[in-house]
């Protein structure tokens, strides 16, 4: 609760690798368009011994700004296009079929679904087991600290699972909680 009696809301955009582990994040107030967070996130991550070849995202990231940011860094993207009246989406891109499914070239659908599943898996784990969506501290810096702590726990679980010789538990926050 803020001092004015209004609830302060923040959002976090994070990049997840193909194994479903976070690579980095950036936080902003809830009223900032998520598309504006893509470039700062890529600036922070790309070049720090991290090579990004392909990015998958929801249709909300379909914009020239995002596509230009990815193209300037030589990163391919699998982002479905929204269906808009008066616009015919090219057949070589994914299009949103309904809220969850996409249609388009089969190879892009397979890639998109696999990468989105890893991202959604991380979202589900941190929201259900680490109360990620119940952030109560004030301030954007505290939101960043909250994200860092949550991701430290995610990595700690993976490390402990490896040390125990139980790689099947690397995603199981509940097992170690």
Language model regions located:
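A short, polar/proline- and glycine-enriched secondary-structure boundary/capping micro-motif
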Residues: 33-38, 89-90, 173
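Polybasic low-complexity intrinsically disordered regions
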Residues: 1-72
């Amino acid at each position: 609760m803020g001092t004015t009696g209004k609830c302060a809301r923040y959002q976090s955009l994070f990049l997840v690798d193909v194994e479903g582990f976070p690579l980095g994040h950036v936080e902003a107030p809830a009223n900032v368009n998520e598309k504006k967070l893509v470039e700062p996130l890529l600036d922070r991550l790309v070049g720090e011994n991290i090579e990004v070849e392909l990015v998958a995202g929801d249709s909300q990231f379909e914009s020239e700004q995002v596509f230009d940011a990815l193209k300037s860094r030589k990163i391919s993207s699998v982002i479905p296009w929204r269906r808009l009246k008066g616009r015919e989406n090219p057949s070589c891109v994914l299009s949103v079929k309904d809220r969850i499914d996409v249609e388009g070239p089969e190879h892009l659908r397979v890639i998109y679904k696999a990468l989105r599943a890893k991202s959604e898996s991380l979202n589900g784990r941190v929201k259900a087991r680490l109360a990620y969506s119940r952030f109560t501290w004030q301030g954007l810096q505290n939101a960043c600290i909250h994200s860092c702590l949550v991701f430290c726990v995610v990595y700690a679980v993976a490390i402990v699972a490896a040390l125990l010789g139980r790689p099947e538990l690397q995603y199981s926050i509940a097992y170690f909680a």
